[in-house]
From Swiss-Prot:
This is L-rhamnose isomerase. Mn(2+) binds at H262, D294, D296. Pathway: Carbohydrate degradation; L-rhamnose degradation; glycerone phosphate from L-rhamnose: step 1/3. Keywords: Cytoplasm, Isomerase, Manganese, Metal-binding, Rhamnose metabolism. GO terms for cellular component: cytoplasm. It is found in: Cytoplasm. The lineage of its organism: Bacteria, Pseudomonadati, Pseudomonadota, Gammaproteobacteria, Enterobacterales. One of its GO terms (biological process) is rhamnose catabolic process.
């Protein structure tokens, strides 16, 4: 530890103690908040089922930065590099298309054995795993419908895929000793004016009920459902709307997934957390950065990321909110994208933990909104960066932008050789 870092740390402890904050306790609390990193940033959502196939479902990964992972070995190596540069607890979020098999496997036939390498790797790196059925980039999703499909056979195929995915998810939780959160997102919707908006939603309701009919130990598996406003090619109607899934999660007591990019650009999920928590047992967050639409840009340490973190901490939702990331930028180094976004999420959580929330709540309750605003703004100037750097130091990860040198070296030695 450098003298400069030690001096900054001691000063930060004093400054935060002056406003009633124990920075050591804040760091202990930060270690209770894992962030689930998404595997699909590493290969632009290609997966291993058909890596040369096109990405469908109204989502896009734009850019052609060289060096993307082409197989599971490369993806795990890239993840290891990213994980080594991010302090504190992490998880990994997998999609079904990241299965490993010597022969083709239909999506309704996936089994735990197709993910045994991921489980062994997660054990070795002390990671929890989360999971997602992949209801896109497939011939039977080509017309834009899956679980809400009017064709009974196609709809049943996707039901069976989601049921098989739940068994994989439960296997993750059983093997790793931490519950896997399995999130269901489907692209189902229509491009133009839709006459019958009810029937697809009735089909989706019945399909989801069949999907979750098999009971699993909640210590191993947690169901989540995710809404969306629109997607490319489904601008006019989305079956799985916010109202649909809010009602479903509340009535079935599943987790509700809130994705930062899945609402109108003037809406923010930070404002939805406290409302949803009154009705659903758990929330899954997909922290992202929408630029004009659900563009899935890399997460910044911006106002909304901070507001999301503050909601979790202020209301002590540590055990009810699962923090995941969802972005995929193919225009920059993909390992750097993981590191930037995940470190930013953790920085936001730390800043929230360093807030004198009790004092601010008292000011608010007494009607002293002047002092509330003044202290909230002054809080931004306190030396949280020194606390962050100490956290990085204790977890043997680089402080500041030193991690970028490691990424550049890896790019030169490993990524540049991929063609």
């Amino acid at each position: 530890m450098t003298t400069q870092l030690e001096q900054a740390w001691e000063l930060a402890k004093q400054r935060f103690a002056a406003v009633g904050i124990d920075v050591e306790e804040a760091l202990r609390q930060l270690d209770r908040l894992p962030v689930s990193m998404h595997c699909w940033q590493g290969d632009d959502v290609a997966g291993f089922e058909n890596p040369e196939g096109s990405l469908t479902g109204g989502i896009q990964a734009t850019g052609n930065y060289p060096g993307k992972a082409r197989n599971a070995t490369e993806l795990r190596a890239d993840l290891e590099k990213a994980l080594s540069l991010i302090p504190g607890p992490k998880r990994l979020n997998l999609h079904a298309i990241y299965l490993e098999s010597d022969t083709p496997v239909a999506r309704d036939q996936i089994k735990p054995e197709h993910f045994k390498n991921w489980v062994a790797w997660a054990k070795a790196h002390k990671l929890g795993l989360d999971f997602n059925p992949s209801c896109f980039s497939h011939p039977l999703s080509a017309d834009g419908f899956t679980l809400a499909h009017a064709d009974d056979n196609i709809r049943q195929f996707w039901i069976d895929h989601c049921k098989a995915s739940r068994r994989v998810s439960a296997y993750f939780g059983e093997q790793l000793g931490t519950p896997s959160v399995m999130n269901i997102w489907i692209p189902d919707g229509m491009k133009d004016i839709t006459v019958d908006r009810l029937a697809p939603r009735q089909r989706l309701l019945e399909a989801l009920d069949e999907v979750i009919s098999e009971k699993f130990d909640p210590a191993h598996h947690i169901d989540a459902v995710e809404s969306k406003l629109f997607g490319i090619g489904a601008e006019s109607y989305t079956v799985g709307s916010n109202e649909f899934y809010m009602g479903y999660a509340a009535s079935r007591q599943t987790a509700l997934c809130l994705d930062a990019g899945h609402f109108h650009p003037t809406e923010v999920i930070s404002d939805k957390i406290s409302a949803a928590m009154l009705y659903v047992p758990r929330l899954l967050l997909h922290v992202s950065r929408p630029v004009r639409w659900d563009s899935d840009h890399v997460v910044l340490l911006d106002d909304e990321t901070q507001a999301i973190a503050s909601e979790i901490v202020r209301h002590n939702l540590f055990d009810r909110v699962h923090i995941g990331l969802d972005f995929f930028d193919a225009s920059i180094n993909r390992i750097a994208a993981w590191v930037i976004g995940t470190r930013n999420m953790k920085k936001a959580l730390l800043r929230a933990l360093l807030e004198p929330t009790d004092q601010l709540r008292q000011l608010e309750a007494s009607g002293d909104y002047t002092a509330r605003l003044a202290l909230l703004e002054e809080q931004k100037s306190l030396p949280w960066q020194a606390v962050w750097e100490m956290y990085c130091q204790r977890h043997d990860t680089p402080t500041g932008s030193q991690w970028l040198e490691s990424v550049r070296a890896y790019e030169k030695e490993i990524l540049s050789k991929r063609r």
